[in-house]
């Protein structure tokens, strides 16, 4: 039986790795949303050969608190096939991505239990933000460069301000009158990498303004120089992320281990694989394929939805996509904050923001280069300024190693202000990119539409 084999493999792995867990804070956000599967129900099935398959299906689709959202997946596909209103396709696809993203995180954790902490960490680095990466790739294929930029920027802002702010606020309210301590080592590393990301985003922007002001000149056009600089910075960012992974998985692994869980709710049972290795790989590939389908629907329907809802594409990409697309991970971070496990919460929020900034964004630039799409790191003035202020506020908030609800409120208010900026900002009519796709962000400053 596969279930028995998985449990036996779990016991062997526990004996082989008594201290070095392959679980990261990112995986553990999915663990907080898991629920026990009903083994007794499977045993009642009269046909014995079907029991392993049904147990597998139950673990994948029903052993999560988000199982109620799975019907949105076939509904989104049906809405697209039967040519329903594109707003319905967009909304159902977003809802369907919520449980799929949580299941990808769960399946990554299952595979990591077999492969060990190093390979598991690398797998998490690749699949941890699979939804954002897949949406970015489909947007690049359709030439919607600004959708790529805004969605990735929105994921970073959402993790730094919305997720972290909500977590600190909820944790502070539950622990009213007391401060919640956390280990600063992990947050210091993450914020340093985020400041490097801000520098790499600012360099092409500053170069463009310096050339436009006549203070400096370049051998090619300003756009070509900015593109070359962006690609060079992308290599620097990826090299920094590789160094960060080596630091996290090899030399300083103890800084990133969620020690609070060892004696807490996530007991030893969570260390035993719930699925076999082959099954986990199969379901991971299948879930990724379904995410690709829904991501294509989201990218293809975002502009009609923008017109129908009266919202700019930049607002939907920066605010709505990250909130809904990462809802499972966000909920996990908040749950751990409520349990006074802020180190795991910081690992989820800061880890995801770092992963997107230092891995997904530069990878998107280089993939666009291979595809012949001219995507740079110049996210324009409002976007880059918002990123800088978000990183700066987060760094100051986390500098003393303790938290209370007021810090959460301040982070949330910063997120509201940034969201309001993109709500009122619009692109001048008729602006298009080199591929002919309408963009929501102009080359220079943004304009504000009158109500």
From Swiss-Prot:
Residues 9-37 are annotated as: Disordered. Pfam families: Na_Ca_ex. It comes from Oryza sativa subsp. japonica. Changing residue 144 to A: Reduced transport of Ca(2+) and Mn(2+). One of its GO terms (molecular function) is calcium:proton antiporter activity. It is a multi-pass membrane protein. Residues 80-86, 142-153, 213-228, 295-317, 374-378, 426-451 are vacuolar. The keyword Calcium applies. Changing residue 351 to A: Reduced transport of Ca(2+) and Mn(2+). This is Vacuolar cation/proton exchanger 1a.
């Amino acid at each position: 039986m596969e279930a028995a084999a998985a449990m036996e493999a779990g016991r062997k792995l526990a004996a082989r790795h008594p201290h070095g867990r392959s679980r990261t804070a990112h995986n553990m956000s999915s663990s907080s949303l898991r629920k026990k599967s009903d083994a007794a129900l499977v045993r009642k099935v009269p046909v014995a050969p079907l029991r392993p398959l049904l147990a597998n299906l139950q673990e994948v689709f029903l052993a999560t608190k988000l199982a109620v959202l799975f019907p949105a997946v076939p509904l989104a596909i049906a809405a697209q096939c039967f040519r329903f209103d594109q707003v319905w396709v967009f909304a159902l696809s977003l809802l369907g991505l919520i449980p799929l993203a949580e299941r990808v995180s769960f399946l990554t954790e299952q595979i990591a239990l077999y492969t060990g902490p190093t390979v598991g960490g690398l797998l998490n680095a690749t699949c941890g933000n699979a939804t954002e990466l897949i949406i970015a790739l489909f947007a690049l294929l359709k030439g919607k460069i600004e959708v790529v930029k805004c969605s990735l920027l929105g994921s970073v802002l959402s993790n730094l301000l919305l997720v972290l702010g909500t977590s600190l606020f909820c944790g502070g309210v539950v622990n009213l009158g007391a401060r919640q301590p956390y280990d600063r080592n992990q947050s210091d590393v993450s914020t340093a990498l985020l400041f490097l990301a801000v520098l790499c985003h600012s360099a092409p922007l500053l170069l463009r303004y310096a050339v436009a002001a006549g203070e400096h000149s370049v051998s090619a056009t300003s756009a070509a120089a900015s593109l070359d600089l962006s690609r060079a910075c992308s290599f620097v960012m990826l090299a920094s992320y590789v160094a960060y992974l080596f630091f996290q998985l090899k030399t300083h692994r103890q800084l990133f281990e969620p020690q609070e869980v060892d004696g807490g709710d996530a007991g030893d049972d969570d260390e035993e694989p719930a699925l076999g290795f082959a099954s986990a790989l199969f379901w991971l590939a299948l879930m990724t394929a379904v995410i690709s389908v829904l991501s294509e629907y989201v990218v293809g329907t975002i502009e009609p939805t923008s017109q129908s809802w009266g919202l700019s594409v930049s607002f939907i990409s920066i605010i709505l996509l990250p909130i809904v697309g990462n809802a499972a991970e966000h909920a996990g971070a908040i749950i751990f904050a409520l349990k006074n496990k802020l180190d795991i919460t910081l690992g989820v929020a800061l880890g995801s923001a770092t992963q997107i900034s230092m891995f997904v964004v530069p990878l998107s630039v280089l993939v666009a280069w291979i595809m012949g799409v001219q995507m740079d790191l110049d996210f324009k003035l409002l976007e880059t300024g918002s990123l800088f202020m978000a990183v700066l506020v987060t760094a100051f908030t986390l500098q003393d190693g303790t938290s209370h609800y007021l810090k959460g409120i301040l982070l949330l208010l910063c997120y509201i202000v940034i969201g309001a900026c993109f709500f009122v900002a619009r692109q001048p009519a008729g602006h298009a990119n080199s591929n002919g796709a309408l963009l929501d962000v102009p080359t220079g400053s943004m304009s504000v539409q009158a109500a």
